[in-house]
Amino acid sequence: LYPQYTLLKQNSAYFVALKTDDIHVQRGLYFPWKKGISERLVISNLEQFTSSLKSNDIPVMKNLVINYDKVTSVAIAGNSGSGKSYTLTYLLSVLKNISDLIIVDPKFDTPSRWAKQNQIAVIHPKENRSKSDFVSEINESLSQCLFIIHKRQGILFENPHHEFKHLTIVIDEVLALSEGVNKNIKDSFFSLLSQIALLGRATKVHLLLVSQRFDHNT
């Protein structure tokens, strides 16, 4: 079938029932696939490309599009120099048209420069403040996001069909952010992240986290 179709990997065999009374052929194997193969996007003008996108679709590769309405959270992982910042810049450029953004940039690097160019506020370290103060500032912002979630839940209780604008919390180097920080502040930080990840889906509040690794220890 390759390259006309791309088979989607499954964890185990996928059986389907067939419309027949013959017990020998009442079942069949189902192979999910999509037409074509995914190829890298080549974008000559990012601003023009993002403005031409329809609805809440985010192209990841050719023949591979993600609907942001169906996304809970996004994680970008990779070693240094693997292109995490490049990918993040692309996603930010797409998301700015469909979502409100809260950007946290511990390295005061690429996301901060992008935010400045697009006139979006960014939380970054300051010379006269400790790392614990910096994470405390982030916790305040996350608490406000959690308040928004609870407020939106109340609106949904009265009107289940109410549509909210997406709100995306972007945190670069999320694991390195908590190293060397007061334990109470660190625990509060991860607790807020967990609550937002758990409750944010129905209220269209998302996390976009970037780190060198994500595993069961993190």
Placement of each model-derived feature along the sequence:
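P-loop NTPase catalytic phosphate-binding loop
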Residues: 27-154, 167-168, 175-218
